């Protein structure tokens, strides 16, 4: 859930993998190039990746290495680039810091767990079911919690001590956000990635003040106008991680005519990983 929802009618979708069919004469791309791209432009209201053809800004389009399938590229783009931007650029995560990831079995959460582990951090993965708890174990987080069945604060503090979290990666909002904030250490950093619960929380400003906590917004798409070269470098690093098998995107491929059913599943937060629709 974001603040910049387009007006109807519109073609949904804002990430795609495919082949360049048209580009400007001074483009860094050529017709026939394999690419992944975000088809939204900040504040433009433009989306469109569910269409057979769509338009994308060069600032958020990247050449896809031949060794990476379109399906994997589509699953990687926004999840991993968002998490990399959050952890590397915004939080400046350091080795041995403790990271709490909410919704850790979703596409973005999985990427955050993997990238934090690459940086040498200790990772707490919070999920909403025992199925997801079992699933996320393959990525070797240091602690996994089903917050529907266990008390997040009690379990975390039993293992790591009082208020041990250095970086809190939140894409849920609501009550899980407030619980995570209260686990942050002095000078901790809270990364606000989204509001999957639909509940935009109050900021607990008095708590942020007395604990010297930094609240950081994460909206990678708007950063294209600030430093597109940085995003391009980080995208290359992510592709290298994939080719070196240090990250493993989790996704299910579906036929495009199944997309309504899967959008409903995503909305009910019953999916694991990402859904890639094929045309």
Region roles according to the model:
Residues 1-42, 48:
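Glycine-rich beta-strand-centered segment in the early N-terminal region that forms part
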Residues 23, 103-104, 172:
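NAD(P)H cofactor-binding loop motif with strongest signal on the N-terminal glycine-rich segment
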Residues 29-30, 93, 184:
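Short, well-ordered loop/turn sites that connect or cap secondary structure elements
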Residues 38-103:
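NAD(P)H dinucleotide-binding glycine-rich loop of Rossmann-like/cofactor-binding domains
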Residues 74-149:
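Mid-domain Rossmann-like dinucleotide-binding core that forms the NAD(H)/NADP(H) cofactor-binding site
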Residues 143-213:
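Glycine-rich cofactor phosphate-binding loops and adjacent beta1-alpha1 units
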Residues 186-193, 203-247:
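Rossmann-fold dehydrogenase core element
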Residues 226-279:
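C-terminal hydrophobic helical "lid"/dimerization subdomain
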């Amino acid at each position: 859930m974001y603040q910049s929802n387009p007006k109807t009618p519109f073609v949904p979708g804002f990430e795609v993998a495919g082949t360049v069919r048209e580009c400007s004469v001074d483009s860094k791309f050529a017709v026939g190039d394999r690419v992944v791209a975000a088809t939204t432009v900040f504040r433009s209201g433009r989306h469109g990746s569910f269409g057979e053809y769509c338009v994308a800004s060069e600032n958020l389009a990247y050449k896809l290495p031949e060794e990476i399938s379109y399906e994997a590229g589509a699953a990687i783009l926004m999840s991993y680039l968002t998490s990399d931007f959050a952890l590397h650029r915004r939080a400046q995560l350091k080795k041995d810091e403790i990271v709490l990831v909410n919704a850790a079995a979703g596409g973005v959460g999985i990427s955050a767990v993997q990238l934090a582990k690459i940086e040498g951090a200790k990772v707490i993965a919070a999920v909403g079911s025992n199925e997801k708890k079992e699933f996320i174990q393959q990525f070797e987080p240091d602690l996994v919690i089903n917050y529907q069945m266990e008390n997040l604060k009690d379990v975390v503090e039993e293992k790591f001590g009082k208020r041990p979290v250095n970086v809190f990666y939140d894409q849920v909002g609501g009550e899980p956000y407030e619980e995570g904030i209260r686990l942050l250490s002095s000078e901790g950093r809270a990364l606000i990635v989204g509001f999957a619960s639909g509940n935009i929380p109050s900021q607990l400003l008095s708590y942020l003040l007395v604990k010297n906590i930094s609240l950081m917004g994460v909206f990678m798409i708007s950063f294209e106008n600030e430093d597109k070269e940085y995003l391009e470098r980080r995208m290359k690093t992510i592709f290298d991680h994939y080719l070196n098998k240090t990250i493993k995107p989790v996704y299910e491929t579906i036929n495009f005519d199944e997309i309504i059913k899967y959008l409903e599943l995503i909305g009910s937060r019953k999916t694991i990983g990402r859904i890639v629709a094929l045309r």
